[in-house]
Design a protein with these regions (language model features):
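ABC transporter nucleotide-binding domains
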Residues: 1-186
Length: 187
């Protein structure tokens, strides 16, 4: 079976005041369609950096210094940002580790949920609203219509994490990366 995602010999380096720091060195794995892969390791071992590399969301002081990241055989490293924007959310989505900082505090939950739906699902505001409310229900948020009009600071940490999960699955991506998705959940 062909891999949906293939990461081969990935190397990521950060430029620091003290010089070059290699955060990921030689990571390789593949994920087939319909499969689940868990990457475990101690804090600081490069799990999140690997995930951010796949999405090409590394900071300006970081660079992929070697290796390959392929989605359905297509190399992602070096793709123009415009093309990566089409891939993010639509083909690959991520549940980020920290819902406290991942949501924009100046935008309502509804605005933040509707944006990727309108962008990737080619629908208008009314349909995006309906889909966003539905996905909030699916992740266990009570009174989703009310929550759509609220700002992140008005929600508990667990509810914010559920919003992050809803945002990640809202466009039904082919690959979902979950970086400690249950960290803040009230379960």
């Amino acid at each position: 079976m062909a891999s949906l995602l293939s990461v081969e010999n990935l190397q990521v380096q950060f430029q620091t005041k003290k010089g070059i720091n290699t955060a990921v060195d030689g990571v390789s794995f593949s994920v087939e369609k319909g499969r689940i892969l868990g990457i475990v390791g101690e804090s600081g071992c490069g799990k999140s950096v690997t995930s951010m590399s796949i999405l090409q969301l590394l900071g300006s002081n970081a660079r992929i210094s070697g290796g390959s990241i392929k989605l359905d055989g297509k190399e992602l490293i070096g793709l123009p940002e415009k093309e990566m924007c089409r891939i993010r959310g639509n083909d690959i989505a991520m549940i980020f580790q920290d819902p406290m900082t991942a949501l924009n505090p100046t935008l309502t939950i509804g605005t933040q949920l509707m944006e990727p739906i309108m962008l990737h699902q080619n629908c208008g505001k009314k349909e995006a609203w309906t889909r966003a409310v539905d996905v909030l229900k699916r992740v266990g948020i009570a009174a989703p219509e009310k929550r759509m009009k609220e700002y992140p600071h008005q929600l508990s940490g667990g509810m914010r994490q559920r919003v992050m999960i809803a945002m990640a699955v809202s466009c039904e991506p082919r690959l979902l990366i979950a970086d400690e998705p249950t960290t803040a959940l009230d379960v």
